[in-house]
Amino acid sequence: HIDDLKGCGNDAARERLKKQLAEDFSDDLKEQLHEFEHIGIKHVQNTSTMEVYTHQNHYVDQLHPINVDLVDRTKEDSLVAGVVYALFRSLLGAMQWLLQTRGDIVPYVGCLQRHANTPTVKHVLMINRVLRWCKHNKIGVLFAHIPGPIAMAVIADSAYKCEPDDIDCLAMR
């Protein structure tokens, strides 16, 4: 079962790969080219330069800061609980999802992750600040076209168990 495969190449290489996948698995393949959204990430290819820009800016637009009226901002070291705790954890999960295309927020999200179980008012203010940054700085990842011979890199998103007696399903093969 192949659930996701992203690739790039010239038309002939793409057709060869599609043919092989159809022979090995099924001809029920869905191909998306040039501009599409896949697993929440938008992909936009410049058909002149062949560069591909990926981003999650549409997802950022859907996120909302935590209402700071729910906390006492004069007590930044106070632990948050209840609904604020739940909102913090939810927004932190959203920020973690953004790390696929937002390298600019990695250190901040990493810092907030260390306090995921015991967030304080200060962390609520911090996560709101990171969200504001994301909303005001719409960025993503630009993949440049690299001409040359065909190469394939495969990164699996699931565990495999090839043989019935394999006990280590996470073995590198």
Task: Give, region by region, the residue ranges found by the protein language model.
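Catalytic palm subdomain of template-directed nucleic-acid polymerases
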Residues: 1-25, 44-51, 114-121
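Catalytic palm active-site di-aspartate
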Residues: 1-9, 33-44, 60, 94-95, ...
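Eukaryotic basic, amphipathic alpha-helical target segments in cytosolic regions
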Residues: 13, 25, 29, 103, ...
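Residue-level detector of intrinsically disordered/flexible regions characterized by low predicted structural confidence
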Residues: 20, 30-32, 44, 140
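Short secondary-structure junctions
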Residues: 23-35, 66-70
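Intrinsically disordered, low-complexity coil segments
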Residues: 30-33, 46-50, 164
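Divalent metal-binding acidic/histidine catalytic loops
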Residues: 50, 55-173
